[in-house]
Design a protein with these regions (language model features):
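Primarily recognizes the serine-hydrolase "nucleophile elbow" in alpha/beta-hydrolase
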Residues: 88-166, 173-178, 182
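Short beta-strand element of the alpha/beta-hydrolase
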Residues: 32-41
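Short beta-strand/loop motif that positions the catalytic acidic residue
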Residues: 189, 194-197, 201
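A fold-wide structural signal in alpha/beta-hydrolase
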Residues: 35, 60-70, 108
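N-terminal cap/lid segment of alpha/beta-hydrolase-fold proteins
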Residues: 1-31, 83, 158-163, 187-191
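Short amphipathic alpha-helix adjacent to the substrate-entry channel of hydrolases
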Residues: 30, 49-67
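Catalytic nucleophile-loop/oxyanion-hole region of alpha/beta-hydrolase
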Residues: 48-49, 69-104
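Acidic catalytic loop of the alpha/beta-hydrolase fold
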Residues: 156-157, 200-203
Length: 203
């Protein structure tokens, strides 16, 4: 395994956990691997350590190339900054897919809690014109995840929202709350999704 640290923006860093090239694995390494970008939770106030290395190593052991995103958090979590960070990460992984031996059509996002909200946000807002402009691309397909794994995610900004998470990423105006109520944004262009919760999660 080799690890690379890749600055994305003023407040965001992408850490890559990549399979090392070796004589024993060279034939296997010639095959492109799927990849996954992990977004830890933390209420958009911090990125939780417990949702970083453990899932990263698990996915790496499954044969994936793995990336962990430290995205912009409060007080820099407004104005779609975390979403832009994740979109930039997706764009970077796609653009360097040959170098990193990644199948550019098999790049998933995985998020935990508020990180699940972030991952799902890219799943429904990957073609947001403002985010595309900030990423310097007119090709929305570069930013679209091929699949999503949402782990006990924050989803709604409506009546039953996780208040501290949504307060850090959204304003109180109706337009903003509707934008971040992801259950209302699902369409036929939303990527295939595996979503799971636990019965003991009171949030």
């Amino acid at each position: 395994m080799r690890v690379e640290t890749l600055p994305l923006s003023e407040h965001a860093v992408l850490t890559a956990y990549l399979h090392s090239d070796s004589p024993d694995l060279r034939a296997l390494e010639a095959v492109s691997r799927p990849a996954i970008i992990i977004c830890p939770g933390g209420r958009y106030a911090f990125c939780a350590d417990v949702e970083r290395d453990v899932p990263a190593i698990s996915f790496l052991n499954m044969g994936l190339q793995v990336f962990v995103l430290d995205y912009s958090v409060e007080p820099f979590a407004g104005d779609k900054r975390p979403l832009t960070d994740l979109a930039l990460a997706m764009k970077l992984v796609r653009e360097r897919s040959v170098e990193w031996q990644i199948d550019a059509h098999k790049i998933a996002v995985c998020g935990f809690s508020a990180g699940g909200h972030l991952a799902a946000s890219l799943g429904v807002h990957w073609n947001d014109s403002q985010v595309m402009s900030r990423c310097g691309t007119a090709d929305a397909a570069l930013l679209r995840p091929d699949a999503m794994v949402l782990c006990y995610p924050v989803i709604t900004a409506g009546e039953y929202r996780h208040k501290s998470s949504i307060a850090n990423v959204s304003s109180d105006c109706e337009e903003s709350l509707n934008y971040w109520s992801l259950e209302t944004q699902v369409s036929t262009s939303t990527p295939p999704t595996f979503l799971w919760h636990t019965m003991t999660d009171k949030t």
